Amino acid sequence: MRKEVKLGDILDYEQPNLYIVRNSNYDKTFDIPVLTAGQSFILGYTNEKENIFKAKENPVIIFDDFTTASKYVDFDFKIKSSAMKILKAREGIDIKYVYYAMQNIKFDNQLHKRYWISEYSKIKLLIPDIKIQEKIVKELDLVIKVLDYKKKQIKLFDELIKSQFVDYAIFKNLEVA
């Protein structure tokens, strides 16, 4: 059985101020990722040890309050700015199911303003029983895993084609731009 609910009725949010990184001296050798909900997602890594959000134990969605971009996070992290919300699932809700559902929401975010409280949290979704949510997540995870594998294959084939072209051009004394 499915029920129609508002996002704000199934997700709690936390202001991220406690988890904001204090310096931006990032280094790949550091352990803790610094996140943004935008395109880049992982901005770098910090060696700061205090006030780390523990998403490895309880996954969350980070939600950019201005762009409405969101990312599913299941590892410990710090964040870059307070322009996001950390969304947590309430009991009986699979956070990853909600994340997948949010990726399909069409939303006009053209104005420069915060959206979660005023508008986005009021968007309604059909939510099935938790067992069905978990089954859907399992299926979608598998599809995404296959897609990621296929993308890697395409990249490797593209590199192979380029290298074959270069080899051919060298063999035939052609110029390669």
What would you call each of these model-derived segments?
Residues 1-19, 24-40, 124-137, 149-177:
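Non-catalytic DNA-recognition/assembly elements of restriction-modification systems
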Residues 5-125:
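DNA target-recognition domains and sequence-specific DNA-contacting regions of bacterial/archaeal
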